[in-house]
């Protein structure tokens, strides 16, 4: 990809700035010599690799995971030579600097933005009292769905009306489906797939609680989206999630299904407290993840990079 872009830009001189979204390929090093250039890194993929290895079964699966992530060697060579990097959280900045051996002074933090005309509180919609929503954008261990499923199985003895709506698509006959059968959760779990943004927002708005169970997030779109929709949040105390959620949700130890069960029960017993937090969180999300504000931050970065490039 980087080589194709490099060749293309050799013959096109009408761009003010080039922005690369985490290809981290050698061609980018050539491009930054001839154009004002910014690299966007959401988070270091070394973290995905780490958790994939932890949850791999057997030698062959680990072998193929290592083979798949072989591009990380290229990433680690290219990243330290990039002049300007933007990432969406202070936690990602720390991890990028550490894993890719980059001077943190070359990394700036600008959060991701939301479409707040879609992800917003719907005052005309009453949430379902025992409906919980979670998002698993990929059926991988990194998203921590196992923890949520086990916590739901533990809470059902006291709260049998609990239902979990999962925004995501499990692999057919894969790990997640096996766990659901083993825990006898089939009648308590529904998967929502191929949703529009409006439909995703509805899942937040119609739920009484959102659970974010990821083991690692460079930002955490589901957390920000749920906050913007005014949905109470319980989240793992992992990576960038405390930074995104601030004091507007309940945190628990990543991977601890018993702790998550206790948090869910605490929510059921103290709904008004959590709903008050959610109202404050919605205001915070609207101020912090507002694209108009974020666009101005990016514009400031673009102008600075262009000016530096033109004066060198």
Residues of each region from the PLM?
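Short alpha-helical donor nucleotide-sugar binding micro-motif in glycosyltransferases
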Residues: 194, 202-207
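Conserved donor-binding/catalytic core segment of Leloir-type glycosyltransferases
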Residues: 125-143, 149-152, 165
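Aromatic "clamp/platform" in nucleotide-sugar-dependent glycosyltransferases that forms part
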Residues: 215
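Membrane-proximal helix-turn-helix segments that form the acceptor-binding/catalytic region
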Residues: 62-85
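Nucleotide-activated donor-binding/catalytic signature segment of Leloir-type glycosyltransferases, i.e.
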Residues: 176-198
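Conserved acidic donor-binding segment of nucleotide-sugar-dependent glycosyltransferases
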Residues: 250-257, 266-271
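Short hydrophobic beta-strand element within catalytic cores of glycosyltransferases
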Residues: 232-235
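Carbohydrate-associated surface elements
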Residues: 91, 113
């Amino acid at each position: 990809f980087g080589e194709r872009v490099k060749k293309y830009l050799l013959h096109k001189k009408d761009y003010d700035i080039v922005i690369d979204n985490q290809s981290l390929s050698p061609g980018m090093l050539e491009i930054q010599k001839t154009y004002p250039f910014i690299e966007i890194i959401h988070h270091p993929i070394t973290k995905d690799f780490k958790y994939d290895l932890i949850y791999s079964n057997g030698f062959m699966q680990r072998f193929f995971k290592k083979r798949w992530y072989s591009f990380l060697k290229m990433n680690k060579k290219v990243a330290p030579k990039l002049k300007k990097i933007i990432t969406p959280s202070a936690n990602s900045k720390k991890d990028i600097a550490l894993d890719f051996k980059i001077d943190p002074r070359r990394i700036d933090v600008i959060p991701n933005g939301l479409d707040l005309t879609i992800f917003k509180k719907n005052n005309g919609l009453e949430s379902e009292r025992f409906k919980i929503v979670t998002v698993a954008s990929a059926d991988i261990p990194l998203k921590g769905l196992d923890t949520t499923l086990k916590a739901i199985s533990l809470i059902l003895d006291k709260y049998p009306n609990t239902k979990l709506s999962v925004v995501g698509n499990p692999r057919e006959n894969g790990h997640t489906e096996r766990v659901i059968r083993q825990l006898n959760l089939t009648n308590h779990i529904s998967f929502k797939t191929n949703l529009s943004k409006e439909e995703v927002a509805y899942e937040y708005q119609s739920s009484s609680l959102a659970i974010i169970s990821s083991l690692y997030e460079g930002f955490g779109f589901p957390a920000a989206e749920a906050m913007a929709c005014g949905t109470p949040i319980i989240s793992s105390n992992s990576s960038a999630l405390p930074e995104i959620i601030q004091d507007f949700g309940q945190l628990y130890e990543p991977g601890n299904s018993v702790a998550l069960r206790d948090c869910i029960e605490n929510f059921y017993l103290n709904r008004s407290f959590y709903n008050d937090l959610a109202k404050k969180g919605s205001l915070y999300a609207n101020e912090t993840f507002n694209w108009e504000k974020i666009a101005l931050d990016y514009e400031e970065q673009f102008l600075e990079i262009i000016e530096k490039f033109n004066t060198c």
